[in-house]
């Protein structure tokens, strides 16, 4: 990626690059901690921002980028309302659905072990699901 973006003197570390989706796969997006801010940085919430462009890649390669980050190439897109409908019909309503959602966390987003991400997400989902069931039980 550094060679393709003509970034010189990268810091000696390996960075996993994720596939964000089939649209504009030549464009990179960096999800990162809010300790980094650039003109193209968009805050998502109090612990997560996104920045597009090569400037952040230059800073990451030079060791001056955000403390934690995740690089993705490309993105997915849905028609208006389509994603919401798919997620509403998701698990547990439809066990064959590919959608399970849970609250995002820095631990989940920035874990370096991709297999660990699944475990963290499913543990979080199960905890949230059980908590919701318990709240429902106590209010009925």
What are these regions (language model features)?
Residues 1-72, 76-140:
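A short aromatic-anchored loop/beta-hairpin motif
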């Amino acid at each position: 990626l550094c060679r393709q973006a003509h970034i010189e003197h990268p810091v000696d570390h390996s960075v996993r690059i994720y596939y964000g989706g089939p649209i504009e796969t030549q464009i990179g997006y960096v999800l990162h901690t809010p300790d980094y801010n650039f003109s193209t940085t968009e805050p998502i919430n109090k612990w997560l921002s996104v920045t597009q462009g090569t400037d952040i890649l230059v800073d990451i390669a030079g060791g001056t980028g955000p403390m934690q980050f995740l690089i993705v190439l490309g993105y997915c897109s849905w028609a208006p309302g389509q994603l919401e409908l798919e997620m509403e019909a998701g698990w547990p309503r439809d066990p064959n659905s590919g959608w399970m959602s849970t609250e995002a966390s820095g631990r989940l987003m920035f874990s370096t072990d991709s297999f660990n991400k699944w475990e963290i997400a499913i543990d979080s989902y199960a905890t949230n699901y059980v908590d919701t069931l318990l709240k429902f039980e106590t209010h009925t």
